[in-house]
Amino acid sequence: MQFRTKARAVDLLGKGQIADLPTAITELWKNGYDAYADNLNAALFKEGFEELKKSYFILSDDGKGMSSTDILDKWLVLGTDSKSRAEMDIESEETLWKRPRIKAGEKGIGRLSVAYLGNPMLMLTKRIGYPLQALYFDWRLLENYNLFLDDINIPLKSVANLASLESVFNDLKKDFLSNFDKEFDLDDKPIWEGKQIELKDEIINNTREALLETSILKNIFSIFNTRDSHGTLFLTFNPIEQILELSEKDEERIDDKEFILSSLFGFTNDFKDHKKDIQVSLKVFDDDNQNYELLNSAGSFFNANDYNFADVIIDGNFDGNGNFMGNLQIFDEVVDYSFSSIRSKNKNNYY
């Protein structure tokens, strides 16, 4: 006997575990950070920008990217433990020759956060010296409680050159639609029934309507334009309303927008006065053919200079076992301060 997994389990592990939009974006940015990206970008392309027929959302990084083997052995494997073994990377091609980073993700399911952004989705990813990989999927397929994971086909193809991307994209859509060829299970029961028939029709129609419009292709080409290009890009064809509202100036929605932006501000540590390891960006390309930055143009949420206005400052360092050594400043008085962790000292607890 063996366990069998319903497709719904992936939906519950992914979108079901994401509280809000900032969490979804942050989880994907964490994966970009772990992939040694320098730049983590998000961009909303509004309907009407350069004659776009629809709105799109793109989330990208310039990390090490993935080969087809990486996708099959890691990205499509849930709960991978490579980040939770407490093993530091070695400076090499795997780190893009950068200083090893402490991993931000650890559960192996952060990639499923992309389901929260909208549907359907096209993932493009490339490692240095490897061909571009394209994966197409609509996460709503996982909402069918009659499907098992091994019933589902997730199409993946290599892109020999950017000129063939549209052709490959059409092949991916065709392969994805084969998920609906089978109408009955082994017990001769309908796979799609009741209210889910409406969901099925919506998924099929959204896939048939999905296009790579000129402005979107230009953005993709700017990222993957050479053999040595590297990184990962998620293109969402029907972004959720929360994403679309990022471009709104309606006073009634300003609180929701401010919550999203303030949450994303916290992804980087602006209390450090030296150069950041990474840069984050959230741009809007609106229907007036204008583009503007939401995160960096809004002013720093906090910065290192704000320390000067604090009444209490704790300044020091933690070692890999959770012990702290430094000093505590209360108004003008500075005292030495240390803390010894009671955590057991083993390699799984070392950071």
What are these language model-derived features?
Residues F234-E241, E251-S297, F302-D306, A310:
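Long, charge-dense tracts
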